[in-house]
């Protein structure tokens, strides 16, 4: 019975009028709540697994540090990346290195505001002079993503010793030919 009246109202006003109805407002609030709950439940339950995906895919750390984080990156990389497997860095130190890079080395920073203030090692870009950090990569990371990478490195990489065939096959699949060069896990 209200359809002719609604059809006569211009679309913009009709949208505002519909949106302002208390029932519709409640529906919109419920939809927003469901979307929030869905987004939160989509957060990874295993931060190390999420960190591994970020390490290899989004941040592309493996390009320089290698798939096994042993410093054996891609041939086209700058070379000389740290062997993270031998690192002694603590979680907060790993986070700072990933966020801020390492001035004077090819290690980039993943914080888009790095060195604009003193958040990184207590210095600004101007204070670094010739030791300016490498240009930031095209991808920056959120703090939670950097934390997930650090969690992955601490759980699955740091202190693990030499790369094993099992680690290689976990990465490339059982029986991968390239994994034959690595020893079995002791």
Pin down the residues of each PLM region.
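Bacterial N-terminal signal peptides that target proteins for export
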Residues: 18-29
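Gly/Gly-Pro-rich "capping" loops immediately C-terminal to redox-active cysteine motifs
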Residues: 68-128
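Flexible coil segments in periplasmic/lumen-exposed cytochrome c-class electron-transfer proteins
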Residues: 43-45, 49, 57-59, 67, ...
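Bacterial N-terminal signal peptides
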Residues: 28-38
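Short, cysteine/histidine-rich loop/knuckle motifs that typically chelate Zn2+
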Residues: 63
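Ala/Thr-enriched low-complexity intrinsically disordered regions
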Residues: 7-15, 25, 36
């Amino acid at each position: 019975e209200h359809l002719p009246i609604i059809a006569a109202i211009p679309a913009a006003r009709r949208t505002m009028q519909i949106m302002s109805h208390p029932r519709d407002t409640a529906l919109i609030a419920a939809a927003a709540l469901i979307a929030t709950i869905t987004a939160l439940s989509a957060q990874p339950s295993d931060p190390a697994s999420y960190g591994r995906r970020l390490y290899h895919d989004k941040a592309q750390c493996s390009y320089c540090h290698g798939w096994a984080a042993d410093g054996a990156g891609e041939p086209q990389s700058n070379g000389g990346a740290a062997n993270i497997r031998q690192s002694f860095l603590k979680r907060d130190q790993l986070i700072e290195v990933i966020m801020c890079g390492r001035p004077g080395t090819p290690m980039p920073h993943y914080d888009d505001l790095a060195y604009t203030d003193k958040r990184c090692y207590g210095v600004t870009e101007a204070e670094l002079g010739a030791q300016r950090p490498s240009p930031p990569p095209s991808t920056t990371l959120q703090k939670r993503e950097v934390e997930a990478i650090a969690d992955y490195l601490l759980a699955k990489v740091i202190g693990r010793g030499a790369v094993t065939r099992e680690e290689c096959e976990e990465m490339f699949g059982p029986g991968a030919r390239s994994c034959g060069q690595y020893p079995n896990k002791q």
